[in-house]
Amino acid sequence: MPTRRKLLTDTLAAGAGLALAGPLLRPLPAAAAIANSQRNAAVVRRFKTAQGTKDEADAMREVLAPDYKRWRGGIEHLAANARDQGFPGPGSYLRGAFPDRTDTIEEVIADGDRVGMLFRVRGTHKGNLFGIPPTDKPIDIRELGIFRLADGKITEAWFMADELGLLQQLGAKMPARRDGKRIVPPVTGGGEDAEATLARLNVQSPSGPPERNKITVVASKGAAPSAADRAADFRQTRVGFQHLRDYGNAKGVGSETITAALPDRHDRIDDVLAEGEKVWMRFRVAGTHGGRLYGIAPTQKRVEVPEVGIMRITAGKWKEAWYFADELGLLLQLDAVDQVLG
């Protein structure tokens, strides 16, 4: 695998000499591009803040395109494995399970036709949650969404919530389906190699800090940033598989990391967004489970789960990093949900 520094050096040197497989879109002038991104961010904020209010129906008609497609729900695995598949729209259903639910927007990033939003979900478990009876316990988890917009309307969205953290906070196990099956997320082989993403980013020479910051972050898929790449006060506030690491540390096997457990690990890129110093990268962690993972014995199964990194790059140096992966999806692929949840 190429080193991070070689990826970054080669990419910055390549400039406009690299070519995309598809046609290029003519970029908007800088001022128009900023205004367009700000409008898109406002639409996504409207989408979120109207949820659970009397204005929700009108707001959804206002902000969603007629052909709106939700590629992934936040509570994806619990919904897929629900005991009763007859629940209504997932948003309404979740508000029934948590009638005092509040969502707090923590971060928004806008880059052209795409917007990313990180929000915090809090509430009290008062109703049935996909087969989990009420526990009266509070929850406090994070969820994020990545949106695509056209003509001021949301055309696509992708969500991921902290489902493993949710189950841990409720002290609950994965509810059994009526047919006895477990719905496991597929391994699709999707996404794009980091080298291809770097080439795509460099069809036109990077014109400012956001574009260069994208390159810096994507190049980190070749190797973790070195001490020289990080600011003196660099902080990583969360690892992608945080709950599994906590589980492993509690059992004295904290060194059995995801990278050690997947000796052929090869991440693939789905999205990179940048605004100012902020960069979001959505990627797939993929490989064969050939080593122990925080006490989970090797299964030799192929795995592929999404992860999102939220970074801040200042003057070319890594300043902050926060990662969030689909830990419940990984456990489903390894058939290890019951082992971790007890």
Give the predicted meaning of each segment:
Residues P2, T9-L20, L28-G342:
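C-terminal and inter-domain tail/linker signature
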